[in-house]
Amino acid sequence: MSVKVNGLDHLVINVTDVVRSVAWYSRILGMEVKVFDPGKGKTPRTSLVFGNQKINVRPCDADKVDWFTADHEAAGSDDLCFLTSSTPDE
């Protein structure tokens, strides 16, 4: 079985301090900071944008209902979300 990856949708990084982290990425790497509403009454999220790429910045103490995440998240860990034309059945 092979899945055709078309691109990277986004990356999520877990951090202990969202404000400090986005300040660093913005100041040092020139990334644009955006805050967006994920909908469904969830807490607003902060992301870093550069070109067509996005990094979501997740606080380590985020509610698991607000952020779907691994059972053992830690500062410095991350997750990748890919874009694909493959279906779940494939």
Segments and roles (model prediction):
Residues M1-L8, V15-V35, V49-E90:
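Glyoxalase I/VOC metalloenzyme domain signal
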Residues K40-P44:
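Short acidic/glycine-enriched loop/turn segments that link adjacent beta-strands
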